[in-house]
Design a protein with these regions (language model features):
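Conserved hydrophobic/aromatic beta-strand scaffold that supports enzyme active sites
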Residues: 19, 29, 91-95, 115
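Conserved N-terminal beta-strand and adjoining loop/helix that marks the start
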Residues: 2-27, 48, 79
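Active-site-adjacent beta-strand/loop module that shapes the phosphate/pyrophosphate-binding cleft
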Residues: 80-104, 119, 130
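A short coil-to-beta-strand element that immediately follows conserved catalytic motifs
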Residues: 70-79
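Nudix hydrolase/Nudix homology domain
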Residues: 103-162, 264, 269-271
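Conserved Nudix-box catalytic region and its N-terminal flanking loop in Nudix hydrolases
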Residues: 26-65, 78, 195
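Short loop-to-alpha-helix "cap/lid" segments that border enzyme active sites
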Residues: 152-156, 169-260, 265-271
Length: 271
């Protein structure tokens, strides 16, 4: 068993899990069957990537074996590394929209399953690695507004407002702060979630503690850098805010590579 003070040097086991949506925008959770570690805990279904498989092939196989559904398409979303008592795992979560899977759900391993709303999950206990994931799922995938004046979205719990740090008041739950301002300040603002805005690839390593990263794209170098970062896997939702010409050219590439959302907006001042 690995302790908190010792680095976990066990080999990484590659695991893929599916964020399956239905036509109502609900997410599929299932319980772990008897005989497996954490039996009875709820999770996003999936399993180990076998030798010779791609992550997508493993996802297809696991969902057909466990729940009887066939996945035709999936896109990457978040990547997590988590140490359990029994294993150290590299978790790749993939989004599967309502029209990308077919079949009737079946509990082929005796597990329970449930459709849940992002931000309003009602089943427990949840697998330990899924805590940050559930919070990330509550971030809307579309917004109106501008980073320097505020962004408005909606999830299952209602309105979701992101307020610039310079305009934030104590009651605001979601705060957006520029990485340069955060670095000068030396600590994260107090908030339910902190969004950090960056504009260059050199800033990316410094924002790994953010709940959400907003990447402002104003040139081709930044647009390509977003593609590179997504290809390597991101551990938090990455929202891209791009000038119109870069939005038109790269939007589909970013979303297919795992961007959480893409906004069309011009350059803005630090927030």
């Amino acid at each position: 068993m690995t302790t908190m003070t010792e680095p976990d040097t066990r080999p990484l086991i590659r695991v893929v899990a599916g964020i399956i949506l239905n036509k109502h925008g609900d997410y599929l959770l299932s319980s772990r069957p008897e005989g497996k570690p954490y039996a009875g805990y709820w999770e996003f279904a999936g399993g180990k990537v076998e030798a010779g498989e791609t992550e997508f092939q493993a996802l297809q196989r696991e969902f057909e074996e466990e729940l009887g559904i066939r996945i035709r398409r999936a896109v990457p979303w978040l990547t997590k590394i988590h140490s359990y008592e029994h294993a150290r795992v590299h978790l790749r979560f993939m989004r599967v929209e309502a029209g990308w899977w077919t079949g009737e759900l079946q509990a082929r391993e005796g597990q329970a399953w449930s459709w849940q709303k992002a931000g309003d999950f009602t089943v427990s206990p949840m697998l330990p690695a899924n805590g940050p994931l559930l919070k990330a799922l509550s971030v809307p995938r579309s917004f109106t507004g501008r980073p320097d004046t505020g962004l408005e979205g909606e999830n299952a719990s209602g309105a979701y407002r992101v307020v610039p740090f310079g305009l934030a008041e104590p009651q605001h739950k979601h705060i957006l702060i520029d990485e340069t301002v955060l670095r000068a300040r030396g600590r994260m603002p107090e908030a339910e979630s902190v969004w950090v805005r960056i504009q260059t690839a050199s800033q990316w390593p410094r924002v790994q503690d953010a709940d959400v990263v907003l990447w402002q794209v104003g040139n081709r170098e930044a647009a390509e850098a977003v593609c590179g970062v997504l290809a390597g896997g991101v551990s938090m939702p990455l929202v891209v805010a791009a000038a119109p010409e870069w939005n038109a050219s790269y939007r589909r590439r970013w979303l297919d590579a795992g961007a959480h959302a893409v906004l069309a907006c011009e350059e803005t001042e630090a927030v």
